[in-house]
């Protein structure tokens, strides 16, 4: 006979008797109890894992939300700094340099590349719209020529119809009234086309200013990273080199300009200045093309030759 101590267990199962059948029943009960305990442990682990995943998901969403807010606030700070710089001589803060070097890296490069691509796409669409407007004007001119010819034919008909009865005269007068109405419609269409031309010119001006500001910001980043500055187009969309001006790639290039060249640059960018200014003209031009690095802002300009 076996000792009951050999069948001690954590489930308070009674020990079997000396028969083999009773021992098998005891073993089956013990196995079911163990399986139930393991399932319960696995279920607890699964619930703990799900809670951990939910916590990580909430943490990640919170971090993303906070980062988006920070990026938005930082972008707003940059825009305000640029706006203040354009409205007056505001010293560009040094924390922008540190922030650009430590946080942005190549992000500005990619952003400006996408903005240039979007700007090129907008320019292509504007060019297509202008071509369509030109085509429409040509068709309008042809239609007006045809209308003039139709009027001449109407006058000839009226001369002949004067010999006919008065009833027929009334009908042709009605035709003339219709032609006058058509003329008025064409005049109205011409006015609308002229208005659209003015809007297109306004859009072109805004587009050029947008390109100018974009290139200015790009040069600020390139200057901080030690790269040569890219050419900043004038407000009319022309490149400075097309006007016979030397390119500006670094602050030393500005120092080598003559006063006439410096004035021509500032006028192209729409910058106001006093004719009596000398070195300040160079500083204005430096800030306008985006040479905002510490080395550029601390550079000592010389008088014009």
From Swiss-Prot:
The keyword Coiled coil applies. It holds the Pfam family Mug135_C. InterPro entries: Mug135-like_C. Residues 27-63, 120-207 form a coiled coil. Disulfide bonds: none annotated. Keywords: Coiled coil. Belongs to the UPF0612 family. This is UPF0612 protein C337.02c. It comes from Schizosaccharomyces pombe (strain 972 / ATCC 24843) (Fission yeast).
């Amino acid at each position: 006979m076996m000792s009951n101590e050999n069948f001690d267990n954590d489930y308070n199962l009674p020990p079997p008797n000396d028969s083999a059948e009773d021992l098998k029943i005891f073993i089956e009960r013990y196995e079911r109890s163990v399986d139930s305990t393991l399932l319960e442990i696995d279920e607890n682990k699964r619930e703990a894992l799900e809670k951990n995943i939910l916590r990580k998901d909430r943490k990640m969403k919170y971090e993303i939300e906070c980062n988006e807010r920070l990026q938005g606030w930082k972008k707003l700070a940059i825009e305000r700094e640029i706006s203040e710089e354009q409205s007056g001589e505001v010293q560009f803060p040094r924390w922008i340099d540190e922030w650009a070097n430590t946080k942005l890296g190549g992000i500005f490069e990619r952003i400006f590349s996408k903005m240039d691509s979007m700007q090129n796409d907008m320019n292509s669409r504007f060019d297509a719209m202008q071509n369509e407007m030109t085509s429409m004007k040509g068709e309008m001119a042809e239609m007006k020529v045809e209308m003039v010819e139709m009027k001449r034919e109407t006058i000839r008909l009226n001369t002949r119809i004067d010999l006919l009865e008065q009833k027929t005269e009334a009908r042709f007068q009605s035709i003339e009234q219709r032609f006058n109405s058509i003329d008025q419609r064409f005049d109205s269409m011409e006015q609308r086309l002229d208005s659209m031309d003015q809007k297109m010119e306004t859009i072109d001006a805004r587009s050029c200013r947008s390109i100018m500001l974009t290139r200015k910001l790009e040069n600020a980043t390139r200057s901080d990273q030690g790269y040569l500055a890219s050419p900043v187009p004038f407000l009319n969309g022309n490149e400075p080199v097309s006007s016979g001006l030397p390119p500006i790639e670094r602050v030393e290039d500005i120092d080598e300009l003559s006063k006439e060249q410096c004035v021509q640059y500032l006028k192209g960018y729409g910058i106001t200045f006093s004719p009596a200014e000398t070195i300040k003209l160079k500083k204005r031009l430096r800030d306008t093309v985006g040479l905002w690095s510490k080395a550029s802002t601390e550079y000592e300009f010389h008088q014009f030759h």
